[in-house]
Amino acid sequence: MGSLRKDSYNKKVAEAFAKLLPEGYESVFVKIDDLPFYNEDLETPEQAPAEWTRFREEVRGLDGVVFVTPEYNRSVPAVLKNALDVGSRPYGHSVWDHKPGLVVTASPGGIGGFGANHHLRQSLVFLNVPTLQQPEAYIGNVANLIDENGNIVEGTLSFFQTILDAYLDFSNKLTE
């Protein structure tokens, strides 16, 4: 998740996607809020921060990655960009390589994080993350899609299920 907020809309969206997974699939939320900013000077076995090592090992063990992020100034939050950078290094040892990806953006605004969605996709192309193209997952006006108990409303869940089913089909075809 690209958001650090305690009551993040994107956290609610990510949790809703996780609950929709069919039997036999497991979701893991990989911690990124503790990652020191990437600095190539620290890229030695003796100096690499333990958080980088933990993060890389966790992502390396995943079969695919679902990125759920807000949009900040038509781009992704710095914490998410930093996680992409940490995972992509050292060069030639990227943890992202060939992992099927899904990009979901949620925003209180009407265009649903369109700028962040496409900016993230640009980075994922370079990182060699094959990403589901259709259906696109822009969740606009997200504040109106959450009920008084903090849950995503039913009609939106069916849209999420359509996206998730397409991603799982895409991912399975890539890994067969």
Where are these regions (language model features)?
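Glycine-rich phosphate/pyrophosphate-binding loop and the adjoining helix
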Residues: 130-176
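A generic structural motif
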Residues: 22-29, 130
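N-terminal beta-loop-helix "entrance" segment that forms/cooperates
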Residues: 32-49, 146-147
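Helix-loop-strand module that forms the ligand-binding subsite of alpha/beta enzymes
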Residues: 47-127
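Cofactor-binding loop segments of dinucleotide-utilizing enzymes, especially the Rossmann-like FAD-
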Residues: 2-3, 32, 106
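N-terminal beta1-alpha1 ligand-phosphate binding loop
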Residues: 1-25
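Short connector loops at secondary-structure junctions
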Residues: 28-37, 136-144
